[in-house]
Structure formats: structure tokens, C-alpha cells
Amino acid sequence: MSYAYDTIADIIRLAEENNISFGDVVLRYELENYDRNEEAVIREIEHRLDIFEMSIQDGIAYTDKTASGMSGGQAAQLDCQSPRFMSEIAYKAMTYAIAVNEANAKMFRIVACPTAGSCGVMPGAVKAVADYYQLDRATVVKGFLAASGIGNVVANRACVAGAVGGCQAEIGTAACMAAGAIVEMMGGTPRQVGHAIALCMKNLLGLACDPVAGLVEVPCVKRNGFYAVHAITASEMALMNIESQIPPDEVIEAMNNIGRAMPAALRETSDGGLAVTPTGTAIAERVQSL
């Protein structure tokens, strides 16, 4: 049989019909459509997981400021302290996500998942959960497979670029991927993965992409920390059988429609939002003079 899918509903249906997980459907689709065996697919995913680890380490270890002076050292500042209010998982997810985006801002190697501007959410949330529960590599690989299926659906049916759909498309997709990965890793059902996606995306619709000075630093770096925790919140709800009234595919469609209705000033042009505040404008002028 074919494991082709166009929607989240397709993946859920295929998983339930074959009594397999959400991530297993994505794996079988890969094997069915590309000239690779399972070992090769897993090896490629493990390579990306290794880069997750390296980018977290780089972001924490290298504390110098970026050329713009807007970021650098914040992940290390969090890493050397203990949380006052947050759980250990949430605090680590926030720290790791910021670390990866600081690494990105300094041109270290990262995995764009789905974009460079949102590259911290998946590594941050997934590593925090995997470390806390001491999950093995095979389990994390399954989570990565689920996340890749989610990203494929959003990219093909909507958009993942801030220039097209605002930051809701970038950080929103990243958070959905992370939430789905966590549910998969924790043994959740395909339907719970779907609800995690819907709950996650619903609660960031309309988010603008307004980078100061056109750089992927403000508000991007700290925003990754916030939305790594958001992904964990969505996965927690879904695993507790809290359901979204709006199905995931309809939420994705709504995101796409909202994004395309946004003015260009709020879609990565730096012509609106935080980028044109007095402070944002002054930073842009200073950066341009460097």
C-alpha cells in the first residue's frame, strides 16, 4: 500500500489503519519514495541530532557578542543559574533554544527546522525532554520523523517562511514540529500528535516577523526560548487528552490565510513592528554604519 500523505489527517489515518505511530508513517513514506533504506534514513537523522547537540554547546560556550551587539551570552547566563519558577524541562528547553539561535547569529552550524530563524525550538524542546526522561536515541529519532512529517505538510499546504507568512509561519511551524515530536517520543497516539499541532499553532496565529536591522537576532533569539516552552505546553495538554476544537489541517490553513493577509511590513521586511520603533531604528542605523 501507499504511505503518501498530503495532510495531517492523512498521516493519522494511515497510522491508525496500519496500527503504527505517526512517525512510522513518515518513515515508510521516505522508504517508499526515495532511494534509501531505513538505516540510511536513520543515519541522516542521527547526524542532524548530533548537530543539535553541537549548536547547543556552541551557543552556551561562546559568550561573545555578535557584530551587531544585540545577542550573545544569554544562553550561558541562563545555563549557569537555576530556575525560580519554571520546571527543569521548561527551563532547559528555553536555555537550549536560545543557545542554538545565538549560535546561528554567530554563523555556527545549525539545523534549519524548518528555518534558521526558528532553529532553536526543536533542539531545545526535544533535548530537554529526552534528557529528563533519559530517552534512547531510537525514541528521539522517531520524534524527529514525526516532526519532519509535520514540517512537510505545513511547507506544502501553507508556508514556513517569515517573508511569506510572518513569524507565525516560521516559529509556529517549528513549535508544532517540536510539540509533535515530544508527543511521539512520549508514546502518544497519532491523534494526540494532531491535537498537539493544532493547540500549538492556534495560540500563535498572527505573530509578526519584524526583525530589528533585518538581522535574525531581535526578537528572534529570545522568541525561540519562549516557543520551545510553548511547544512543551501543547504536548503536555495533548498527552492529557485535551483536544483542539479546530482540526490541525484547518489551523494550518488559517495560519496560511492570516499570513498572506498580513501587510508586507510585518513579513520580514523590517518595515514595521519592533524594527521601526525608535530604539529599533537607532540600532539599524548603528549596524548599517559598521
Regions found by a protein language model. Name each.
Residues 123-134, 179-187:
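Alpha-helical support elements that line or immediately flank enzyme active sites
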Residues 107-125, 169-174:
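Conserved phosphate/anionic-ligand binding catalytic regions in large, soluble enzymes, centered on
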